[in-house]
Design a protein with these regions (language model features):
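Short beta-strand segments
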Residues: 73-75, 96, 126-130, 213-218
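Catalytic core of membrane glycerolipid acyltransferases/transacylases, capturing the structured
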Residues: 78-98
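Solvent-exposed loop/turn segments at secondary-structure junctions
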Residues: 78, 133-134
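Conserved H-X4-D acyltransferase segment
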Residues: 66-76, 80-82
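Divalent-metal-activated hydrolytic enzyme cores
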Residues: 2-67, 88-90, 99-111, 115-123, ...
Length: 229
């Protein structure tokens, strides 16, 4: 059984256990690859205290259930998530995977759409890609990830097909970062197109119960941009 309380019993003696970045006292990151379970639980305690200070009553509200306004379909990239909207826990139902894909043959995707639209009654669906996406870069570099990553390679063939469809326009962009951003935008549009073909989405759109938005997050500035679809 996992102990959930003992690591936090003595906060005063705990601080020296933290494995923060030794090369930068002012690092923005809370944990590192060397952090222990104790560190993770201590940070959770700090987070709860911060939330109770800044948003009192939030946990009481969330304890009674959820009624999110938005379904967020984003990339699993560690540098962004729905919190870039400055929302609180309980506002956004999130679905994330590599390169923010909507897979019509995937049971997880289909059930997520049905649950968020039919049960939770979200009013917005956002597909949000981002700059400097590894899946996008891999496609543009025509890189072979090797046999050990065969499932990943198969997964990313959808990006490769999109790259091939848009290759003429992409090749007109000489700046590689801008080219990658453009393919990320194309990918957002593609996923929105796939969403609009799903029965549960079609029904909700016909009833004017939901809106679909496409966004791209800039990892180097924190700002979102609208993708015209």
């Amino acid at each position: 059984m996992v102990q959930t309380s003992s690591p936090l019993e003595d906060d005063h003696t705990h601080h020296h256990h933290h494995d923060f970045h030794t090369d930068a006292e002012d690092s923005p990151f809370a944990l590192t690859k060397q952090s222990s379970l104790r560190d993770y639980l201590y940070n959770n305690k700090l987070w709860v205290e911060k939330m109770n200070d800044h948003k009192p009553g939030l946990f009481d509200i969330n304890g009674k259930g959820q009624s999110p306004h938005t379904l967020w379909i984003g990339c699993s990239d560690s540098r962004y998530n729905e919190n870039v909207l400055n929302v609180s826990p309980g506002e956004v139902f999130a679905f994330k995977n590599i390169a923010n894909m909507v897979s019509i043959d995937d049971l997880t995707t289909k059930s997520t759409l049905e649950f968020s639209i039919n049960v939770l009654k979200v009013k917005k669906i956002i597909v949000c890609g981002h700059t400097d996406c590894g899946g996008i870069w891999n496609s543009l570099s025509y890189k072979d990830l090797g046999a050990a990553n065969s499932h990943l390679m198969d997964y990313l063939t959808r990006i490769d097909r999109l790259r091939d469809e848009k290759i003429d326009e992409l090749n007109k962009i000489s700046d590689l970062k801008l080219r990658a951003k453009r393919l990320a935008e194309f990918n957002v549009v593609k996923q929105l197109d796939i969403l609009r073909q799903q029965k549960v989405v079609i029904n909700a759109l016909n009833k004017e119960e939901i809106e679909l938005w496409g966004l791209v997050y800039n990892v180097d500035s924190g700002y979102l941009e609208v993708v015209e679809a």
